[in-house]
Amino acid sequence: MRFFVCILVLLFVHNQFSRADKTLIDDSLYTEKYIRNIYIPEPRRALQLLDEAENRKTIPLRVVNELRSLSYSNMYMNKLAFMYARKAYLLDSLYQKDPKHMLKMTVHLAEFSAMMSKYNESMRYAL
């Protein structure tokens, strides 16, 4: 009987270690680098991962909005892409932590405005 209990304890401990490894692997899915690699071939999956990353707060919100914008743009949903690019731009202009990111979002906004035939707005972002 004692032998049987020892085997059950060892199996339980082994199971816990294997689950811990899976958790570490799952957390690597919610990184900016991984999502940037998959948003072109799998935009819907990237959007699901972005929702979870936003809930877990593993990526800053301005970057989440940028990646959402790029994913929607890849699915030819230009209005949603513009909306999320604008959200990222507004967060950048409020916090002013990363001027390169703000410039990148300004370029995206100009491109999305031109795609939606809003040329005056596109010129405003371009200037």
Positions of PLM-derived features:
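Sec-dependent N-terminal signal peptides
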Residues: 3-12
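A "functional boundary" signal
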Residues: 17-127
